[in-house]
Amino acid sequence: MLSLPLLLLLLWGMGSHSFPTVPSETREEDVEMVQKYLENYYNLKSDGEQIEKQRHRSPVVEKLKQMQEFFGLKVTGKPDAETLNVMKQPRCGVPDVAEFVLTEGNPRWENTHLTYRIENYTPDLPRADVDQAIEKAFQLWSNVSPLTFTKVSEGQADIMISFVRGDHRDNSPFDGPGGNLAHAFQPGPRIGGDAHFDEDETWTSNFRNYNLYRVAAHEFGHSLGLSHSTDIGALMYPNYFFTGDVQLSQDDINGIQAIYGPSQNPIQPIGPQTPEVCDSKLTFDAITTIRGEVMFFKDRFYMRINPYYPEAELNFISIFWPQLPNGLQAAYEVSHRDEVRFFKGNKYWAVKGQDVLYGYPKDIHRSFGFPSTVKNIDAAVSEEDTGKTYFFVADKYWRYDEYKRSMDAGYPKMIADDFPGIGDKVDAVFQKDGFFYFFHGTRQYKFDPKTKRILTLQKANSWFNCRKN
């Protein structure tokens, strides 16, 4: 009879070669992590009897596949590096598939006027900051539903909120810093609806780990009856990301309104939607190369491709650069400086790797010499061979010398004159293998700057290995 850790080690030996091998000195530690993760969030039974009964269809493999499918990973049933990376991310303690409820079916509050009480306060933040974070988190949900929330200072409330650590006598102990950040129980009597936050975490009111407002808003979704979402852009996605602007996605809004009905507001609120890489109508805000990869930006998200992995990675911009705003308008790489510059409005940021350089953001007029009539940059690209950077603004473009750090004389010029066939407006552009790739709406033009000719016309998302467009 195989023990669960041994079975996991055997699975590792059969692992995919698409990802880096797990170092042997950390393998045992990761095996234990995988076991605990699947037990905690995917209802894996660790008893040897179940494994023996399902010897030819291992429950470990099935649970790994279930987890990989939930997170949109390549479904292999093997604990590859990408799977381990997702498992190591901080997250909500509510399981993704197992029951974590006190009532059968789809629990909901019968009363839409709910009360909450903060039983104790974390010392990480001033009490006023905790009160504000909790109030704002509830307001997110009340804005899109008929629910109201009133704070009480004593007695039993519908939703009791506490900061605790370790084993706090609810059969769901916390695990220390990182990992399981908080959990909440779905509507019901006694502990139903209550939210617990791990006091071993450091709670903040900014982008540093962990933003209390962001985590509380997620947990209160559980308190109201919502389960986890597979939509990475949803607030109810299980893993923790801080995107700067905590908001409900359309997926979250649809979920809460399915339980309680629409908001009482005359105009129903609409939330952002997560881009789908194989959507034939997909457009981009900005695109740039970065150290051999290509990154496409849309709203709060980036989509990344590299030569070694065919699937596009979709994630939040804030994962790499929490200081950058959402809705970037232009970006380009300065390869000889190992920098990427991002633009929004009249400001730009320079980054090296995952670090935003000191002194940024800066003003585009002072740094590049744009006239005051230029309010923002639509697109930008830098030629690696010449050090010339092209800035596209409305139907004109400027050319900037990265070595001299000055605008070239004789600009701006008309886009249509020097880049015939691409139209007079550019949404995004990048250079690869000597060619420019211009994007406007759902179209992409491969352009040869030497011959000034369009070579191909394709869908904007043709880089994403989609079967149909």
UniProtKB/Swiss-Prot annotation:
**What does this protein need as cofactor?**
Ca(2+); Zn(2+)
What is the top-level taxon of the source organism? Eukaryota
Ranges for the Hemopexin repeats:
275-324, 325-371, 374-422, 423-466
As recorded, the propeptide runs across 19-99
Sites binding Ca(2+) 1 sit at 124, 199
Report the activity regulation comment: Can be activated without removal of the activation peptide.
Q: Which sequence ranges are marked TM in the entry? A: none
The residues listed in the UniProt record as binding Ca(2+) 2, with positions renumbered to this chain, are: 158, 190, 192, 194
Gene Ontology cellular-component annotations? extracellular matrix; extracellular region
Quote the record's cofactor note. Binds 4 Ca(2+) ions per subunit. Binds 2 Zn(2+) ions per subunit.
One Pfam family it belongs to? Hemopexin
Substrates-to-products reaction catalysed: Cleavage of the triple helix of collagen at about three-quarters of the length of the molecule from the N-terminus, at 775-Gly-|-Ile-776 in the alpha1(I) chain. Cleaves synthetic substrates and alpha-macroglobulins at bonds where P1' is a hydrophobic residue
| Annotated Ca(2+) 4 binding sites | 285, 329, 378, 427
The yes or no answer to whether the keyword Membrane is present is no
Regarding domains, what does the record say?
The conserved cysteine present in the cysteine-switch motif binds the catalytic zinc ion, thus inhibiting the enzyme. The dissociation of the cysteine from the zinc ion upon the activation-peptide release activates the enzyme.
What is this protein identified as? Interstitial collagenase
State the organism of origin.
Equus caballus
